[in-house]
């Protein structure tokens, strides 16, 4: 069950969510795990129960998936407690692709480099030539994004081959990571420009993904391209906000960099 499939309400209470997370009703347990993450409930009891839920065996689909584990893994990243790191690293071995994906994303959010060796091990999964099989191997895009955010420069040799990956979103995740890991501005700009070119892709969902990537890395050179992308203004504004946030620390308040002024003007035009 994804966030888009769940009601966006705050009718549950912390105490009831904790009870529901331990009850026999699997639907209530899944919802409670989602709710705790959605509303950033950073209660130690909640975190402990969510960590326990990563080992749940009761909620399993006919296809072998673990919906409760998925929601628990996603929630733990949002709660920001690094006590979950070890359990999330173990979850990277789960047979459920989406649990592994959620665990990688949450480890990226938690920012603990202890997960880098395991992520690198997953990245070394042999790549086959069939796209259909690649979809079921590893969540390569989530792994690459995590390595970039975590600053794992030692993984650059393993990331580089993914720039030629047959799945576009994986290829662009590699470019995003290389931008973050490149110390030379010209080299970083090269990878940022790969993402700019991707904004003209015919696939709307892919354009949305790349907008998110550019916002995450805050590439100033992409500002105009982001503004002109054929996508929802709301997503372009979020992406430009990411670019702006990278510019703000570069000036002494109340002054702004020329880049920040430029981005703010583009944002105004989208409002």
Question: Model-derived features: where do they sit?
Answer:
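Structural detector for internal amphipathic alpha-helices that build alpha-solenoid repeat scaffolds
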Residues: 1-9, 29-42, 62-82, 90, ...
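Amphipathic alpha-helical scaffolding segments comprising HEAT/armadillo-like alpha-solenoid repeats
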Residues: 7-22, 41-59, 81-93, 112-130, ...
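Short inter-helical turns and helix N-cap capping residues of alpha-solenoid HEAT/ARM repeat scaffolds
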Residues: 24-25, 57-58, 64-65, 95-96, ...
């Amino acid at each position: 069950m994804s966030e888009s499939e769940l009601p966006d309400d705050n009718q549950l209470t912390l105490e009831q969510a904790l009870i529901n997370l331990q009850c026999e009703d699997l639907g209530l347990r899944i919802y409670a795990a989602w709710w705790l993450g959605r509303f950033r409930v950073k209660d130690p009891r909640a975190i402990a129960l969510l960590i326990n839920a990563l080992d749940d065996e009761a909620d399993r689909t006919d296809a072998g998936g673990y919906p409760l584990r998925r929601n628990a893994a996603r929630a733990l990243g949002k709660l920001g407690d690094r006590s979950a790191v070890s359990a999330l690293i173990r979850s990277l071995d789960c047979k459920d692709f989406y649990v592994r994906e959620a665990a990688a994303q949450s480890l990226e959010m938690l920012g603990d480099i202890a997960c880098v060796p395991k992520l690198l091990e997953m990245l070394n999964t042999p790549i086959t030539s069939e796209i259909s099989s690649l979809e079921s191997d590893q969540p390569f895009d989530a792994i690459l994004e995590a390595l970039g955010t975590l600053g794992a420069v030692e993984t650059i040799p393993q990331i580089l081959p993914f720039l030629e990956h047959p799945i576009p979103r994986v290829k662009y995740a590699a470019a995003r990571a290389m931008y973050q890991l490149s110390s030379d501005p010209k080299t970083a700009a090269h990878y940022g420009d790969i993402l700019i070119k991707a904004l003209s892709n015919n696939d709307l969902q892919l354009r949305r993904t790349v907008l998110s990537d550019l916002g995450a890395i805050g590439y100033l050179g992409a500002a105009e391209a982001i503004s002109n992308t054929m996508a929802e203004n709301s997503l372009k504004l979020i992406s430009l906000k990411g670019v702006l946030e990278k510019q703000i620390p570069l000036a002494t308040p109340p002054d702004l960099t020329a880049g920040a002024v430029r981005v703010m003007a583009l944002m105004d035009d989208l409002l």
